Regions:
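Mid/C-terminal beta-alpha module of Rossmann-like enzyme folds, strongest
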Residues: 186-256, 265-293
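N-terminal Rossmann NAD(P)H-binding glycine-rich loop of SDR-like oxidoreductase domains
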Residues: 1-21
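Conserved beta-loop-beta element that borders a ligand/cofactor-binding pocket
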Residues: 127-150, 154-161, 166
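Residues forming the Rossmann-fold NAD(P)(H) cofactor-binding site
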Residues: 8-9, 84, 123
Length: 293
């Protein structure tokens, strides 16, 4: 579910190209999905809104495993309530169809911290989905590095447009971004990884670094050296103004919601990925983030 989004479209193409699975892509606008025609016999496109219980139930009929990639931050209304309602509707449809396994991509963040509304919603969605299916694998990730990722594109646009980066003092908070290809590999392996109970699996790239360092690292990869100035306080309205000026409007709207999460460390704190995805974990250890750009 959510096949027309950034991760959804990449995952769909990845599955078709690297596996022999039959894929059913469910989203509001299947006409937006781009794929190689040679895989058309293994791909079924279904138009369904996540709030349409009957349509989702039909889309889940005969499915062995589903991937849930929905977020509502770009929609009108309170996204926390919308995401909860969407998860409830999908969960009920999954239970009705007898779905045995569900994969969900959520966000990192310690449940014991005072989390942003964005991260609270991500975690709440996982709790709701878990209550409806026999087995939920909830991945928690920070920024996914790849063209089309909203967080990544916002950072890229700011670096390209602003020679001086004014960032708040809490930009020293650490994050652990993961490359798109690695996130896709985790999602793909999770479809068949042997598990008997639900798990929260935190995933990240090989390095922890601050948001300030992330900006500097990306800038260096494109031959730039911006002046990065830490300031004690950057009001949310000022950050929103910058986003509106230098990023696409839809990205800016979502970015304003995500910006609140920058005060929360988004790093891997458990080692479940080592237990269930050992080969992928060891592969990641050999990488450096500079290769991700």
């Amino acid at each position: 579910m959510g096949a027309s989004g950034f991760v959804g479209q990449h995952l769909l193409r990845y599955l078709l190209a690297t596996t022999n699975y039959s894929v059913r892509a469910v989203c509001r606008r299947p006409e937006d999905i781009q794929y190689d025609a040679q895989y058309a016999d293994r791909l079924q496109l279904i138009s369904a809104d996540v709030f349409d219980y009957d349509a989702i139930s039909k889309g889940l009929e005969g499915v062995d495993v589903a991937v849930y990639l929905i977020h509502m931050m770009a929609d009108k209304g309170d996204y926390y309530d919308l995401e909860a309602k969407a998860a409830e509707t999908f969960g009920k449809a999954a239970r009705r169809s007898g779905l045995p396994r569900l994969i969900y991509m959520g966000g990192l963040g310690n449940d014991n911290d005072k989390l942003s509304r964005h991260l609270l919603s991500r975690h709440n969605t996982g709790k709701i989905l878990k209550s409806y299916v026999p087995l939920l694998i909830e991945f928690r990730a920070s920024m996914i590095v790849g063209a089309g990722s909203i967080a990544y594109d916002i950072m890229k646009n700011l670096v390209h447009n602003l020679p001086v980066q004014t960032v708040p003092s809490w930009a020293v908070t650490h994050t652990q971004p993961i490359a798109l290809q690695d996130a896709l590999a985790y999602l793909t392996e999770s479809l068949t990884v042997p598990l008997e109970h639900s798990e929260i699996v935190e995933i990240g790239g090989p390095e922890e670094l601050s948001y300030k360092d992330l900006i500097v690292r990306y800038a260096a990869s494109i031959g730039r050296k911006p002046l990065v100035v830490l300031v004690p306080i950057v009001p949310l309205w000022l950050g929103a103004w910058w986003l509106n000026l230098f990023t696409p409007r839809r990205h800016a709207k979502v970015g304003r919601q995500m910006a609140e999460s920058l005060v929360n460390p988004m790093v891997v704190t458990n080692d479940r990925e080592k237990s269930y995805f050992r080969i992928l974990f060891l592969r990641l250890l050999k990488k450096r983030l500079v290769m991700y750009w």
